[in-house]
Amino acid sequence: MNRYTDQVVLVTGGAQGLGAAMSERFATEGAHVAIADVNIDAATALAARLQAETGHTCTGHAVDVTDSAAVTAWADELAARLGRIDVLVNNAGIIRDNRIEDIGDHDWHAVLDVSLSGSFYCARAVLPHMRSRGYGRIVSFSSMSWRGNFGQANYVAAKAGIVGLTRTLALEVARQGITANAIAPGLIETPMLASMNGPARDKLIAKIPQRRTGTPHDIAEAAAYLCSPAAGYVSGIVLDVDGGLGIGSSIR
């Protein structure tokens, strides 16, 4: 199934982890994937591998999403060269966890600048190109923690902001063939989670109704649906991809 044949898909933070899984998913379905990451070596290496494996053009780009002028220039250059921008996935983000009184100004601003401001800058940059063709899909990454979580005030503020940004964006573009949605991942299998000791890991998994962690593949599948033509009547939602954890459980 090639839902993205000839489409241009932009993925920020697209060179590693969940971003890499999504970049691969879109490439396997025929998209030209523009992989943006501050780690240009990782981005270009992944793009080269995906292009070799899928036969579809993939490119790596050094993009700092906190630089609004650079983001706009990147989007404009891609649109001019490729003739279109169909999909934006706002995945770039960082974590600087601490109690509120121990979060310094730098760590507060760093998290919001990358996750929230970066998502805003990227969405603003691609909108003119989507509007001109009457089609677009924007998916931004929130988190199950957007409702509040101990020791993550900066992260929670950013992820809650993404929910508000997504809903407002969905309203503003509702009659322009563009949708905007957010994904809120739960506990996803990552190197950090895998490194946890057995009891601590088991305690977390016991809170998940499905009794397993999610995988990058789970996230990539969710993104591939929301960004597809089939999801044209889905807009303004927060899709929990958490194995049911958000039904009523909380992490302590």
List each model region and its residues.
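Active-site helix of classical SDR
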Residues: 123, 158, 166
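Short, small/polar-rich loop/turn modules that mediate ligand/substrate recognition or access, typified
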Residues: 89, 174, 179, 234-236
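Alpha-helical segment proximal to the catalytic Tyr-Lys
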Residues: 128, 171-172, 232
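The beta1-alpha1 cofactor-binding region of Rossmann-like NAD(H)/NADP(H)-dependent oxidoreductases
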Residues: 40-41, 62-73, 105, 217-218
